[in-house]
Amino acid sequence: QAMIMTDRDNNQITAFHPGAMMQAHITQIEKRSDIKLAIISPDGRDAMVQHAEQLKAADIPFVFDPGQGLPMFDGADLARFIDQATWVTVNDYEGKMLSDRTGLSHADISRRVKGLIVTLGAEGCEVWVDGEKTVVPPVKAASVVDPTGCGDAWRGALMFGLEQGWSLAK
């Protein structure tokens, strides 16, 4: 359960309780020919750790998108996720925290995965591949009412694009 409050300046306060996600680690991921792509996003801590290990062992490519779950992990945990993942995506705030905790720059992280995407809100995003940064301009909104859910929309678009074989910059 999540409650997200946004003021007129787009400052957010989030309250989150994992509820049933605390049992998500019970679900096991096995190698299957019909699973082509996965995502590790905010979940119970144990589930995030175990599912990343299981996806790596099953050779299933996955996106590591820690979101609001990032503060649960120390630098060693986060470095392990990076090394297991195929791609990493974070927003600018999370990207700074990820770099601070791991001691890895965005360029460093991008050399350990196929790509790192750092979203910048209304400013678009940075796509890092092999240490090189490409700035992708934003799609201008006709009007912004509430940014709640933008991260979920981003995840869906990213997964769709990866499944289609599109480049990260597309």
Where are these regions (language model features)?
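Short glycine/serine/threonine-rich phosphate/pyrophosphate-binding segments
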Residues: Q1, A47-M48, R155
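Structural motif
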Residues: Q1-A2, N11-T14, K36-L37, P61-F62, ...
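Conserved N-terminal subdomain of the carbohydrate kinase-like
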Residues: Q1-L37
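Residues that scaffold the ATP/ADP-binding catalytic core of kinase and kinase-like folds
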Residues: A15, L98, W128
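Short, acidic/turn-prone active-site loops that include or flank metal/cofactor-
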Residues: H17-M21, P66-L70, Y93-E94, V139-A142
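A short, aliphatic-rich alpha-helical micro-motif
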Residues: R32-S33, I82, S110
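Conserved beta-alpha-beta core of the PfkB/ribokinase-like small-molecule kinase fold
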Residues: L37-H106, E123-C125
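Conserved phosphate-binding/catalytic region of the ribokinase-like
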Residues: R101-K170
